[in-house]
């Protein structure tokens, strides 16, 4: 496994060797796309890449197809966008702010707020997640000692309804960085990054979604309370690496393999967002550019 080469020398063609017994070789290339944003977002569908361009003069969404042709969409959203998801079943982009969730419809080109989803008890949204081809949205709040995440379902009339609250029961000195819902062979799990203020440590946990019981945990980093740790799940990739974890305060990526062993490797810039695209590319978003690392 030489996945380090994929990131450490992003301007050249590299060779990636998997840890299987066939000694297969894979070519790696990188495409750099300049695009500035003070608060970058990144989401992918099966064929498209969604990012934003937010500067003092511009506030717009940018849609790129698989050929990297750009379409610019002016955004009416005044609040900072803190998260985004691709809603595959309805072919819509979901955009999260601290108080609202918006949709962007690819057919109508309209951005509008989901009026049914409102923060409980005037809390502040932190992050959200969704299973592929599902009509359920999981939302977590930005607070210490978070006790649950909410599950919202969409009805036939396109209205949304709060259906369940799944337990988290964090300690009073803990908060989450992000959540990610995972479906492994019909096992529905929740991946979470958590900061503990007493130990001053970040950790990642895997929990059973319905019970909230943790069945896997790994320490990530210390002394970085101000910057959340995020993650992507490397399902169906050629490498043995299963998770990539990152923070915008660090130029190091934490890679976790199938045996839950960590490897640290450097990247040239602080990473704000990262996504897996079409099972053969890793896209990395910084404040100044989009790097698409593609291997075949």
Residue ranges and their predicted role:
Residues 13-22, 44-75:
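Beta-propeller domains
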Residues 34-46, 77-90, 117-134, 167-184, ...:
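Repeated scaffold domains used in trafficking and secretory/extracellular systems
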Residues 123-207:
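Solenoidal tandem-repeat scaffolds enriched in leucines and small polar residues
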Residues 49-50, 92-93, 135-137, 188-190, ...:
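Hydrophobic beta-strand positions that form the internal "hydrophobic ladder"
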Residues 192-206, 213-256:
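Loop/turn-rich, solvent-exposed surfaces of beta-rich toroidal or solenoidal domains
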Residues 238-296:
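C-terminal closing repeat unit and adjoining cap/tail of repeat-based domains
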Residues 56-63, 99-105, 125-126, 135-136, ...:
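Structural motif
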Residues 3-37, 65-70, 258-259:
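A short helix->beta-strand "capping" segment at the edge of beta-propeller domains
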């Amino acid at each position: 496994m030489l996945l380090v080469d994929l990131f450490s020398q992003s301007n050249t063609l590299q060779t990636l060797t998997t840890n299987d017994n066939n000694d297969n070789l894979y070519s790696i290339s990188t495409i750099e796309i300049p695009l500035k944003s003070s608060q970058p977002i990144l989401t992918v569908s099966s064929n498209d890449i969604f990012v934003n361009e937010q500067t003092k003069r511009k506030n717009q969404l940018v849609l790129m197809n698989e050929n990297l042709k750009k379409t610019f969409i002016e955004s009416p959203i005044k609040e900072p966008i803190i998260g985004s998801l691709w809603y595959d079943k309805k072919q819509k982009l979901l955009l999260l702010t601290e108080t609202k969730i918006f949709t962007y419809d690819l057919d109508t080109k309209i951005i509008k707020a989901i009026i049914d989803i409102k923060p409980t008890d005037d809390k502040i949204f932190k992050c959200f997640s969704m299973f592929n081809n599902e009509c359920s949205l999981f939302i977590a709040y930005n607070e210490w000692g978070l006790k649950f995440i909410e599950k919202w379902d969409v009805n036939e009339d396109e209205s949304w309804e709060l259906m369940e609250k799944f337990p988290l029961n964090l300690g009073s000195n803990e908060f989450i960085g992000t959540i990610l819902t995972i479906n492994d062979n019909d096992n529905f799990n929740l991946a979470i990054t958590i900061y503990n203020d007493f130990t001053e440590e970040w950790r990642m946990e895997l929990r059973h979604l319905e019970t909230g019981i943790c069945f896997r945990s790994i320490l990530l980093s210390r002394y970085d309370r101000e910057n959340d740790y995020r993650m992507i799940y490397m399902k169906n990739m050629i490498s043995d690496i299963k998770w990539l974890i990152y923070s915008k305060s660090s130029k190091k990526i934490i890679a976790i393999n199938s045996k839950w062993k960590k490897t640290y490797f450097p990247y040239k810039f602080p990473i704000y967002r990262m996504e897996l695209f079409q099972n053969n590319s890793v896209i990395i978003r910084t404040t100044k550019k989009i790097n698409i690392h593609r291997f075949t």
